[in-house]
Regions:
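Acidic, proline/glycine-enriched N-terminal capping motif
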Residues: 1-131
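Short histidine-centered catalytic/ligand-binding loop motif
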Residues: 88, 131-142, 193-200
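Short, amphipathic alpha-helical segments
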Residues: 89-93, 143, 156, 173
Length: 247
C-alpha cells in the first residue's frame, strides 16, 4: 500500500522521468480487478487522456497526482503499483491500465489488494480524504510541530490504542499500518497501549519517532516492502539532497 514515503518517492520519480511526455494510447484492464476503483467509466479514460502531456506530479498523504495539460489530473493511491518501461520492453500480460507515450515508452498500473486509478477532467477532486491530505500539514514538514501532534492526541478518543491513533481514519495523512509498525517500534511503545495511558514523555518520544521514521523512510526512497517506478525501492535522493529538502 502506498503510504507517505512511497507517495513522495513516486511523485519525485514521475517528475524526473515522465514530465514532458505526451500520452498517445490508453489500454484498459487485461485482467479486471473488482477492487480496482475508477472515477467514472475506465473505458472513457482514452478520451480524457490521449493527447495530454504530463506536466508534473505531486504527492499528498496517500495520493499521487499526475498533473496533465488542459487541467486534467490522474490520481492514484492505496494498493496501486506503477512501473515505467522503456521503448521495446516486453509488455506485461496483466494490468489494470496502460499508457503509451510519444517516445514509445509506456506506464503500467497494477493493483494487488485494492486501489484507485482516477481521472478528473476539470481538476476537481471530490474526495474527503484527498481534501484532508491537501489541507493538512505534512508530518514531513517543519510546520508539523509537537503542538500539532498534542492536539491530535487531545482530540482522540482515549480508548484508542496507540496504533489506531496513528494508522486509522487518516488522522495523519499518508500514515497507515505499514509505517506505523516502524514508528511504534522506534518509540518502544506497545501498539495496544491506550492513548489515555500515554505519559507526557511517551507522547514526546512518539512524536519524535513519527517525524524521524518518516523522514528516514522517505529519504531512503520508501519501505523495502513496496515497489517504485522502476520495480525497486532505490535511494533516489540527489547527492546534494538532505533530509531537510524532502518537502
Amino acid at each position: 500500500m502506498l503510504e507517505l514515503p512511497e507517495v513522495i518517492t513516486l511523485s519525485k520519480q514521475v517528475n524526473n522521468a515522465l514530465s514532458g511526455k505526451t500520452i498517445t494510447q490508453v489500454f484498459n484492464a487485461t485482467k479486471p480487478h473488482k477492487f480496482t476503483f475508477y472515477n467514472g467509466e475506465p473505458s472513457e479514460y482514452g478520451k480524457l487522456l490521449v493527447g495530454k502531456t504530463i506536466l508534473s506530479s505531486e504527492g499528498y498523504g496517500m495520493f499521487v497526482n499526475f498533473n496533465l495539460s488542459d487541467n486534467v489530473i490522474m490520481n492514484i493511491g492505496d494498493g496501486v503499483s506503477v512501473r515505467y518501461y522503456s521503448a521495446g520492453d516486453e509488455i506485461p500480460a496483466n494490468y489494470q491500465l496502460l499508457l503509451t507515450f510519444n517516445d514509445d515508452s509506456f506506464l503500467v498500473f497494477t493493483v494487488a489488494m485494492y486501489g484507485f486509478i482516477n481521472v478528473y477532467p476539470d481538476s476537481y477532486i471530490d474526495n474527503k480524504y484527498y481534501k484532508l491530505s491537501r489541507e493538512s500539514i505534512s508530518p514531513l514538514s517543519d510546520k508539523y510541530t509537537e503542538a500539532e501532534f498534542e492536539k491530535l492526541v487531545a482530540e482522540a478518543k482515549k480508548t484508542l490504542s496507540a496504533k489506531a491513533l496513528l494508522a486509522t481514519n487518516q488522522r495523519i495523512p499518508g500514515v497507515g499500518n505499514g509505517v506505523t509498525q516502524d514508528i511504534l517500534f522506534n518509540a518502544r511503545i506497545n501498539p495496544k497501549q491506550k492513548v489515555l495511558f500515554l505519559s507526557d514523555n511517551q507522547k514526546e518520544v512518539l512524536f519524535n519517532a513519527l517525524k524521524e521514521t518518516l523522514v528516514d523512510m522517505t529519504f531512503e526512497g520508501g519501505r523495502d516492502t513496496q515497489t517504485d517506478l522502476y520495480l525497486s525501492l532505490i535511494h533516489i535522493s540527489e547527492p546534494h539532497e538532505t533530509r531537510h529538502d524532502l518537502v
